[in-house]
Amino acid sequence: MQGRLSAWLVKHGLVHRSLGFDYQGIETLQIKPEDWHSIAVISYVYGYNYLRSQCAYDVAPGGLLASVYHLTRIQYGVDQPEEICIKVFTPRKNPRIPSVFWIWKSADFQERESYDMLGISYDNHPRLKRILMPESWIGWPLRKDYIAPNFYEIQDAH
């Protein structure tokens, strides 16, 4: 079963994969990184004018990384706005995804957090740098293959 956006993308020959619907009936699509920017622009023009959230996760140790976008179609007088979830999978080695900052400004800190925790580079992001960890931090703490450095806690002298 296809949702409205998926049917529209198929009709116009845009490559994607439908991952079905979640428990709330929200359609989930899988998009390749090289197709993400054009599909993001199309989604915005199609009416998905609000980026509700963006997050990222490590699919499996040594496997792919995923950047997840929850888009909402806000319209006047509509109590239940239409939503869609888009997942962009990227290889662990040199993970790169086009930034959607220039489409939805709310992607700014969310993409930076995904970069900081998982190391996904968002191309054309204006300020892509660490947001939670110090700049000197080595590695990506939320990757499943991350090895935590040895820390020695200094006890307070009483």
From Swiss-Prot:
Q: Which GO terms describe its molecular function?
A: NADH dehydrogenase (ubiquinone) activity; quinone binding
EC numbers listed for it are 7.1.1.-
UniProt superkingdom: Eukaryota
**Annotated keywords:** Chloroplast, Membrane, NAD, NADP, Plastid, Plastoquinone, Quinone, Thylakoid, Translocase, Transport
Please indicate if the UniProt record lists Disulfide bond as a keyword: no
One GO cellular component this record assigns the protein to is: chloroplast thylakoid membrane
Q: Which Pfam families match?
A: Complex1_30kDa (PF00329)
User: What InterPro entries does this protein's entry cite?
Assistant: NADH_DH_suC, NADH_quin_OxRdtase_su_C/D-like, NADH_UbQ_OxRdtase_30kDa_su, NADH_UbQ_OxRdtase_CS
Tell me the GO BP annotations in alphabetical order: photosynthesis, light reaction
Catalytic activity, reaction form: a plastoquinone + NADH + (n+1) H(+)(in) = a plastoquinol + NAD(+) + n H(+)(out); a plastoquinone + NADPH + (n+1) H(+)(in) = a plastoquinol + NADP(+) + n H(+)(out)
Q: Which residues cross the membrane?
A: none
Classify the protein's membrane topology as the record does: Peripheral membrane protein
Instruction: Return the broad EC class.
Output: translocase
Localization recorded for this chain is: Plastid, Chloroplast thylakoid membrane
Main subcellular location: plastid
Q: How does it assemble?
A: NDH is composed of at least 16 different subunits, 5 of which are encoded in the nucleus.
Task: Give the function comment from the record.
Answer: NDH shuttles electrons from NAD(P)H:plastoquinone, via FMN and iron-sulfur (Fe-S) centers, to quinones in the photosynthetic chain and possibly in a chloroplast respiratory chain. The immediate electron acceptor for the enzyme in this species is believed to be plastoquinone. Couples the redox reaction to proton translocation, and thus conserves the redox energy in a proton gradient.
Family listed: Belongs to the complex I 30 kDa subunit family.
Name under which the protein is recorded: NAD(P)H-quinone oxidoreductase subunit J, chloroplastic
Organism per entry: Buxus microphylla (Littleleaf boxwood)
| Gene name, Swiss-Prot/TrEMBL | ndhJ
